[in-house]
Amino acid sequence: MIHSLFLINCSGDIFLEKHWKSVVSQSVCDYFFEAQEKAADVENVPTVISTPHHYLISIYRDKLFFVSVIQTEVPPLFVIEFLHRVADTFQDYFGECSEAAIKDNVVIVYELLEEMLDNGFPLATESNILKELIKPPTILRSVVNSITGSSNVGDTLPTGQLSNIPWRRAGVKYTNNEAYFDVVEEIDAIIDKSGSTVFAEIQGVIDACIKLSGMPDLSLSFMNPRLLDDVSFHPCIRFKRWESERVLSFIPPDGNFRLISYRVSSQNLVAIPVYVKHNISFKENSSCGRFDITIGPKQNMGKTIEGITVTVHMPKVVLNMNLTPTQGSYTFDPVTKVLAWDVGKITPQKLPSLKGLVNLQSGAPKPEENPNLNIQFKIQQLAISGLKVNRLDMYGEKYKPFKGVKYITKAGKFQVRT
């Protein structure tokens, strides 16, 4: 299936390549570089590129391109999913999927790629199995390997490889048995000038940290599971149980993993947590304008909205801005024309505002349209969709584990039009 894999940075340098069958020349990447030059943005490079003798299928992750070379027709999503699994494995092993981390651990990278693909076909892609085959890097292990000349490859075959549950290794033991879940939701929204919602959608994930001994069988139920759309499951989930009862039943992997991702697309279910009052005006034949924005919580949810930042891309005719914030601090870059206001947390009793004058180029025409406000925020212990975990039951083991659920709401692409 996959003949070769090239890792390319944003500068266009191929800093790592791996071949599973015959060696493919780096010149095949010229087709990718041509498509990259034509793209308006790095994220707009075509995922699938056809060449006279190959197909190039790529993903863009953490400022790196993972470019695979295919010689026969295969489902592109199959290859894309595998490339994302490779990037996730690097993230899990090294703490980050960056060029520096990959270069620092290049031997382990090649060992991982050798195990993940067998003659070009996916073999071992589950983190639990890979960590039995190839030990994650540590400072002590790196020192020992440099002295003894040994590698991170394990001495024994993984016990889970022949198991019916490939994502969980056998013989897991913990002194403290714990199961924690993070429900993280991002709001993507567009708010018009009058404050009405043009578009709103919630993207959510449930991340799990499972440290349980033995082979536990878990069931996670929700108060209101029907609001979830387009649910994507970890392979451990029993899909028929979800279809019939809307309960997540699974034997979990050991450690950290993403249990599900989901979407809430019904706009009447999406509550917008903040509002913005704005008055941005530019006078005709004048060298100044007015800038006035106030941000506050839209409804009393009993939770504090924190980590608020407002980013505004001002028109090119703006020279400088003289503003006064009632809370936080702001910066304005006269080169990029980007205004950034770091607000912090807000309370209904004291609404933060940013007011002042905008200096324009003399003689320049009035800007045709006002800039948009891009807002970031975070709300702890709240799932904005209203999703709530009802209970977690465990079967197959006799001990009583520690259980916990944490909710976080964040702004995704949250834009206010002025």
UniProtKB/Swiss-Prot annotation:
Database matches in InterPro entries: Adaptor_comp_med_subunit (IPR050431), AP2_Mu_C_sf (IPR036168), AP_mu_sigma_su (IPR022775), Clathrin_mu (IPR001392), Clathrin_mu_CS (IPR018240), Longin-like_dom_sf (IPR011012), MHD (IPR028565)
Gene Ontology biological process terms from the UniProt entry: anterograde axonal transport; anterograde synaptic vesicle transport; endocytosis; intracellular protein transport; postsynaptic neurotransmitter receptor internalization
Pfam families, sorted: Adap_comp_sub, Clat_adaptor_s
Superkingdom of the source species: Eukaryota
GO CC annotations on file: axon cytoplasm; clathrin adaptor complex; cytoplasmic vesicle; cytoplasmic vesicle membrane; Golgi apparatus; postsynaptic recycling endosome
Keyword Cell membrane: no
Compartments, as annotated in UniProt: Golgi apparatus; Cytoplasmic vesicle membrane
GO molecular function annotation: small GTPase binding
Keywords: Cytoplasmic vesicle, Golgi apparatus, Membrane, Protein transport, Transport
Residues covered by the MHD domain: 176-417
Membrane disposition: Peripheral membrane protein
Chief location of this protein within or outside the cell: Golgi
Annotated Gene3D superfamilies: 3.30.450.60, Mu homology domain, subdomain B (2.60.40.1170)
Keyword Membrane listed: yes
Family: Belongs to the adaptor complexes medium subunit family.
Self-association state and partner proteins as the record states: Adaptor protein complex 3 (AP-3) is a heterotetramer composed of two large adaptins (delta-type subunit AP3D1 and beta-type subunit AP3B1 or AP3B2), a medium adaptin (mu-type subunit AP3M1 or AP3M2) and a small adaptin (sigma-type subunit APS1 or AP3S2). Interacts with AGAP1. AP-3 associates with the BLOC-1 complex.
Function: Part of the AP-3 complex, an adaptor-related complex which is not clathrin-associated. The complex is associated with the Golgi region as well as more peripheral structures. It facilitates the budding of vesicles from the Golgi membrane and may be directly involved in trafficking to lysosomes. In concert with the BLOC-1 complex, AP-3 is required to target cargos into vesicles assembled at cell bodies for delivery into neurites and nerve terminals.
Protein name, per record: AP-3 complex subunit mu-1
Organism: Rattus norvegicus (Rat)
Lineage of source species: Eukaryota, Metazoa, Chordata, Craniata, Vertebrata
